[in-house]
Amino acid sequence: MTSIPNNLAKNAAMGLAPQPRAKVRDPRLDFFRGVGMFIILIAHIPENLWAEWIPARFGFSDAADLFVFCSGMASAIAFGGVFAARGWLMGAARVIHRTWQVYWAHIGSFVVVVSLAIAADRWTGTQFYTSERMGLDPFFADVQGNFVRLATLTYIPDWFDILPMYLLLLAMIPVVMALAAVNRWLVAAFILTLWVLANVFGVNLVADPATGRLWYFNPLGWALIFFTGFGFMRGWIPAPPVDKRLIVAALAVVVALMPPSCQLMFSCDAGGWGASLGLDSGYRTLAEWNSKTNYGPLRYLHFLATAYLAWIAVGEGGRLLSGPFTELMRRVGQQTLAVFLAGLFMSQACGMLLDWLGRGVVTTTAVNLFGMAVLIAVAFIVSWFKSAPWRERKPAAATQALAASQRTPSSARRAARIG
């Protein structure tokens, strides 16, 4: 009897072959991932004046949506081809390998950033950074127990909640590919079921057993945007047409959702324009529809509209993405895990610098640019290491000759030796 994994492998090889466009890395993907890395840095620097002007201040969706959507697209490139060429088991093994890397990245980043906060407290003679800034008092109240829970992902610290969500989304890929081998509509049913569980029934995971705090990024809800990106890059979801009516509709959505977002100039805080215009009641009414934790429908709509406009703006195939700035963004976007981890550290380090230097215009600008420069340096350094410069490079002619000999049939090579 043929085993289920073998059937899945055959189905994957025969029916899940990626579209041609999924085989080539899309320059738009790297560009927008790079942009997202800088926005995430700026957004996470405590009390950062620059954070008042990031895209999240003008609508419901933000850089987290961009990060997860692009991660879904990148996962389709990195893993989808393995499922198609090598079968389900090898594809699942490839996903497990990446999940293992991200798991240790999560654990390591927490240890390093907390060490930075402890060092800052010792230097200043306070408990400000561990207690007030990072809210680690519950963690230190039961260090031994919480370290065990940290390792088992049953304790998710504040500031460190996106990688655990990403881990579970990665773990869903083998399930999604198995369903797609049967029928792609099963994938849609699976993802929508998870989304309904999160948004309608409030199903979520516990981030802190001591307080009952839930995961800030509920993977059941965020699977929708992740696998939307995954589906686009696999060719399961067709690219939208360039249509003036769609452009107008997307613009209308983006503009219409700016006031209800109650951010920046429409702030619903006391004295803000939003409060005087009565937008605060509308904001509270739409809160569940805009849920960041469960990925509410208005958030999804806003991101799709924004993404469509950005897709149109860069031109077909990203042809308008040229020049040194674009290349810099792409280089950063090609090393997102390393850059993201550096951003977690630098956001806290930059916040400390602003605490000590002040938050004037000049110092804020200098500190933000310093943090961005570090991310760029990390991207280039990691890229250099990945190129394995210590390996001996074979001359091009020798490489071509070797490749030609490997393509020559063994019988022809034997005949050549005899002759």
Labelled PLM ranges:
Residues 2-419:
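Alpha-helical transmembrane segments and their immediate juxtamembrane cytosolic regions
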